[in-house]
């Protein structure tokens, strides 16, 4: 059986983590890389023995005949890159978010549908061993769940220290809060029935955002974000019998009813050796390519998370 071939678009830190994850799977080869910054692409190609550095994105498929392409470009380039990659018969794995904002995500989704492209999104926290552990335990009970998601964002740091483009920072709830808001769609059952802002987003004075989300299952989500103030990235899931907490997100711990002791759950070795979630995500991408059951979110699935962000922030 021939090797599964993977191509990479982009040459930043995320590209590097994807290369490591795919290259670790037996029978998978990273065969080409393309980036607007050729020197970075060449450096990664040298480090990971990638045989081809492609100058023009339009030549990437014909030069590599890759089975999978991983798109790790800056959000501002996502629309143009998506318009090109969906033309080819490979499986597309997009880094999140797929678009600068909800409207652009809709546009990209329409481009993919028009080409009948196979598109998935790297919402890697869905593949954390902590997330999998919590979901497996919750599946054993039909008790109602209260999911609290705690978000913290620093747009000033993103703009001035991390040198993110101003337009990206203006849409920072899509660019970065997607990491946290997607947890509602993973941990809550059923469909969203209502999104009720309790403390409204103020774009002129980014501070506190609190929103209640009701699901058809009876599950309730509470989103609390602090902007330009200290706070954790954390998730809790409370049922009558047990409370789960992920703080940090890579570590799940639980507390049983009637006790005060917090018990940590084991963390999978893959989440220590690779960027958390990436190794399993790569495996799931291979399954999607092979037509096997898999846990990758589709482009349309991620669009629902983008829509939830829009509703929470009333934008």
Regions found by a protein language model. Give the residues of each.
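Active-site loop of classical SDR/Rossmann-like NAD(P)-dependent oxidoreductases
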Residues: 269-283
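Contiguous beta-strand/loop segments that form the cofactor/metal-binding neighborhood of enzyme cores
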Residues: 175-251, 283-292
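Beta-loop-alpha module in the N-terminal Rossmann-like domain of NAD(P)-dependent dehydrogenases
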Residues: 39, 48, 52-111
